[in-house]
Every structure is written in C-alpha cells, then in structure tokens.
Amino acid sequence: MTKGASRRGLLAGAAIGGVLAAQGAAAEETPWSAEYWAEKGPVRLYLFRKRLGAPRAGEAPRPVLFLVHGSSNSARPSFDLTVPGKGEYSLMNVFARLGYDVWTMDHENYGRSSRTEGNSDIASGAADLAAAMPVVARETGAARLHMMGESSGALRAAVFAAQDPARVDRLVLTAFTYTGRGSPTLAERARRLDAFRASNTRLRDRAMIRSIFTRDMPGTSDMAVAEALADAELVFGDQTPTGTYVDMTSKLPVVQPEDVKAPVLLIRGEHDGIASMADLQDFFGRLPNGDKQFVSLSHAAHALHYGLNRAQFWHAVQAFLSMPPPVAA
C-alpha cells in the first residue's frame, strides 16, 4: 500500500456525523497554527497552516490538504474566516479537526504576499503553488498532498496538478469552469475585458465582496458572512489583481481534462453562474482517471464553503478525500 493510500485509509469511514461533530468541537479543540514563507524568485509568498496539536517527532503522518484561493480574496479570509455568532466558517478548522494537516497560501499580489507589477494570472498562481511545495514537504515530510481549489483557485490547482502530477494525491475542484460556455457570470465579466487588460488591478470593495453572495441566488448564504469577509479582506486594500479575470474571459480553457491524472472531485452549487452544468459534464467525462466524482449541491451557489449548506460541502469533500483505495481488478 502506498503512503498516500495508507493516509486515506486512516480516515476511511468518516461520514457526515464526524463532520458535524467537528463543527461542534470548536470550544474543545482549537487547532494549532503557524506561518511560513516560500520564495518564487524575488517574490515572497505567505503560507499558513493549521492542524490539531503542534508537530511532534515520531508522530504518525497526517494527510496534507492544501487550499487554493480564488480571484477576489486572499487565503485566510477565504479559508479561516470567523463570523461571530454564526457557527463555524473556517474550512481550515473543520478539516484540521478531521485529522488533516491543512495549508493555504496568499498568491502573488494577494494578502501578505509580495506586491509586484504582474497581474497574477493562472500561470503565475500555478508557479506560486510549485514554490510552496518544498516548504510543505520540509515541514510535513509529505511528498504528495491533497489539493482543493475554489473558483479561479480551482483553475490554479488543476493547472498545477497537470504540470506536477507526482505532487497531487486527490484533487477537489469547486466552483470550477472549463470553457466558460453558458456562464452568465463570465459573459457579464467579459464586458469589462478591455478594462481588465488595461490595468493589472481592479476595484474590490465591500460592495464587490457582497456581490459574490448575491449575484447567483440571494439567500443561499448569510449576509453576515459577506460583512465578515469584507472586514477581513479590506485590511489589505480595495484593489486586487486582474489576471485571473482576463484568463477566465478570454483564454479558457487553461487546462485540458486529459492532462489531469489525479483522482478528481468536481463539485458545483446548483445556482453557480461561473459554469454551466453542460460545460462541467464535458470536463468530467474526459478526465482519464476512473476514480472521479461529480457532486451537485442544491440550495447552493458560487461560494459553497460560505453557504448555509456548507456542512454538505464539507461532507462531500471529506467523503472523497477519505475514499478507501481501490483494489485493482
């Protein structure tokens, strides 16, 4: 049995009860956290890590889960958000309590990472991930890890998985888009393509952050989450890079499914306007690895991990990541 398979086996059998128990365990088990830095040439990239308990010499290895943020918000507001009085919204906390060693990073020009003259397109994001991998391997001992990307972060993750398949064990793509055909969100965004090409940054203010929660199906998220996200993100300013917007409105597809060799979970909220069901079904059908799942979640839109039904999202991801390894025929 491979190391990756044995790690998945440690988590096999966990189901929705375990996920919900993790949600309620906040008071008893506060994850340990640490900060790190990776270097991509002159660019310094901020990494953040959470797990239950500090690392100890000789401990059993834990499965590593790396979370990849999208176009408009940096890593910790995306995946480690606190919403007072509203329950658990930190994806890092949830999966740390499920036994994972959870990592994320700010891409170039986001959050705490270096500011440059670039526009932080998808290719740049994949290069960021490549720069982060030696740090994760050094600190965890893991040569392979699970990766989950959301929205343009899913594109970054898929491109990286295609470029370096030896690094990625299981791959989760949420709020993903393939060709962009049939996407009302991208059609609307394309109207501003000339402006995105003319500047490496765009306005990302409180109103724009709120629109993430309302543009597809209002009511699928608590708007208190939008306010908490804006509070957490706007400390980094009201500008964010345009590169992923240019790519998603003029350069799709940026990855071909045949090039993604890892097992894949493709997960979509039924109201998500970033991609049509037909577009995603086309991508899914062409994935070469037979170990793949396509999950559609009802009463959900683009921001699945911020939604009212986020526990269903946690469950779908955990079920996929903890899948027992297949027995070859």
Question: What are the residue ranges of the model-derived segments?
Answer:
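Conserved hydrolase catalytic core segment
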Residues: 148, 152-179
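Short, surface-exposed "cap/lid" segments of acyl-processing enzymes
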Residues: 56-61, 65-97
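Alpha/beta-hydrolase
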Residues: 186-267
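N-terminal cap/lid segment of alpha/beta-hydrolase-fold proteins
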Residues: 28-57
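Conserved acidic catalytic loop of the alpha/beta-hydrolase fold
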Residues: 127-143
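N-terminal secretory signal peptides and thylakoid transit peptides that target proteins
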Residues: 1-17
